[in-house]
C-alpha cells in the first residue's frame, strides 16, 4: 500500500492515541472528517492497522518482575520449533517471543510476573517442560529505558 503524507500522519496520531475521535483526528491532520474516516478504514482494511489495544500499568496489576529469557533448543527441526512456539504462545506471562540468531540461544522471551517465586514456577514448571528446551539463560530488567510501541511512520 502506497502511503501519502495524510496516511502517515493518521498512523502517527493513532499510534499515540488510538481513542482519538475522527473529528479530532481530521482536525489534527488537516482533512475533513469524511475523507479522514475513509482513509482510516482503508488502512484498517489493508491490515496496516491491525488492531487497537489498551496499554496497562503492570505495576498496578502487581506484575513487578520482567525477565529476558534466552532459550536453547536440543534440535533445530521445523517440528521442534513449531511445537515450542505453539506451547510458549499459550503462556500469558510471555509478552514476546523472538526467534533469534547471533546468541547462544534460539529464542528470546520477554516475560512478566509478580515476583521471583512466580518466575521460578513459570520457568521450572512450564517453560523447561516444553519438549526440546535444552537450556535457559535469564536476565532481569532493572529499569525500562525506552518502552515504545509506536513504529516510525514519518
Question: Model-flagged regions — what are they?
Answer:
Residues 1-154:
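A compositional/biophysical signature of low hydrophobicity enriched in polar/charged and small residues
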Amino acid at each position: 500500500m502506497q502511503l501519502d503524507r495524510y496516511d502517515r500522519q493518521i498512523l502517527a496520531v493513532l499510534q499515540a492515541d488510538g481513542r482519538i475521535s475522527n473529528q479530532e483526528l481530521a482536525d489534527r491532520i488537516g482533512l475533513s472528517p469524511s475523507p479522514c474516516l475513509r482513509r482510516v478504514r482503508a488502512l484498517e482494511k489493508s491490515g496496516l492497522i491491525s488492531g487497537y489495544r489498551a496499554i496497562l500499568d503492570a505495576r498496578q496489576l502487581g506484575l513487578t518482575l520482567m525477565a529476558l529469557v534466552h532459550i536453547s533448543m536440543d534440535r533445530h527441526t521445523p517440528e521442534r520449533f513449531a511445537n515450542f512456539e505453539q506451547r510458549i504462545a499459550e503462556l500469558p506471562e510471555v509478552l514476546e517471543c523472538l526467534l533469534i540468531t547471533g546468541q547462544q540461544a534460539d529464542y528470546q522471551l520477554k516475560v512478566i510476573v509478580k515476583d521471583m517465586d512466580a518466575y521460578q514456577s513459570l520457568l521450572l514448571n512450564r517453560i523447561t517442560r516444553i519438549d526440546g528446551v535444552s537450556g535457559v539463560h535469564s536476565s532481569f530488567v532493572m529499569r525500562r529505558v525506552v518502552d515504545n510501541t509506536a513504529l516510525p511512520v514519518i
